[in-house]
Amino acid sequence: VITFSDYQTIFGSRTIQISNGIDFKQIKLKKHINDTSHELHLIGVAEIHYWHGFDRLVKGLVNYYQANSGYNVYFHIVGNFAAKREENDILPLIKKYNLERYVILHGMRHGEELDELFEQADMGIGSLARHRSGITHIKTLKNREYAARGLPFIYSEMDSDFEGKPYILKAKADES
């Protein structure tokens, strides 16, 4: 069994562990560093599933904006919701707390449109809730794309290729 995880065995069979791979020629490197002295732009690119934990970030923005003003944090969600569950976890929060200005739903984007969104971004949002699916160790493609674009990023799972690197932040693998 070949896996992107660190599991030695799966279903009783020994594994061959590899890292997920990307084609660097297909991924555009971010060209400049944005001025973050007045605002911060986060980007999450995915077919949005519950394990991405984007609802955790939106709840964090609710708490942030209830306690702070003056420094704006924007969350650009790029991709479609996989199911109603994900929509129902995120969209009502945005509406209830008037976050439409700060949580921007772009839908699916590719090519130059996606590259332009990455140019605006200051940090990538990886999976923030892999614990919901029982996965603790995984080497996701999205983390590799953020790194290839030269974008710092945050995630909650264990990814042995990136642990301890200066350009990543780790979120707790829980519901905080």
Q: Where does each model-flagged region fall?
A:
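Short hydrophobic "strand-cap" motifs at the C-terminus of beta-strands
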Residues: 4, 18, 42-46, 78, ...
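Carbohydrate-associated surface elements
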Residues: 6-7, 21
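Acidic anion/phosphate-binding donor-loop and adjacent secondary structure
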Residues: 13-17, 21-39, 50-53
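Conserved donor-binding/catalytic core segment of Leloir-type glycosyltransferases
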Residues: 34-61, 75-76
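Short donor-sugar binding/catalytic loops of nucleotide-sugar-dependent glycosyltransferases
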Residues: 45-50, 81-82, 109
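Nucleotide-activated donor-binding/catalytic signature segment of Leloir-type glycosyltransferases, i.e.
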Residues: 78-79, 87-116, 120-123
